[in-house]
Amino acid sequence: MISPTVFIIEDDVDTREMLAKFLELEGYQVEIAGNGLQALDRLTDGVEASVILLDLMMPVMDGWEFRRRQEKDARLRKIPTIVVSAAGRERMAQISADAYLSKPVDMDELLTRVSQFCAV
């Protein structure tokens, strides 16, 4: 049985690695991108994702622009997206997403949210 894949879109290397290692230990496959443009390129090239963890403040293409483009793509808009950001709740609420997590990330809450969208 193939494990669900979590696609982490995060520019901070330490945060990205911490999230990836934690999720891999919990049985998930992980894909990573350092900004929204890298993620869009990989997803449109056929990389599959069960759920996306999306930072908002990134260089090249931020999370807001990624979500605008994701919503325009019939396949990508179906992928549940969890915003994971240091932006305040009000700022995060300005973007449509399936769930929101504040940084620093509570790993138990992260696991709960991810598992809501894909079971291991």
Locate predicted features.
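Active-site residues of response regulator receiver
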Residues: 55
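C-terminal output helix
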Residues: 105-118
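Conserved acidic carboxylate
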Residues: 10
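Acidic, metal-coordinating helix/loop segments flanking the phosphotransfer/catalytic sites
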Residues: 32-51
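Hydrophobic/aromatic residues positioned on beta-strands within the core alpha/beta folds
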Residues: 84-85
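Charged docking surfaces used in two-component/phosphorelay signaling
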Residues: 17-25
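Receiver (REC) domain active-site loop signature in two-component systems and cognate sites
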Residues: 58
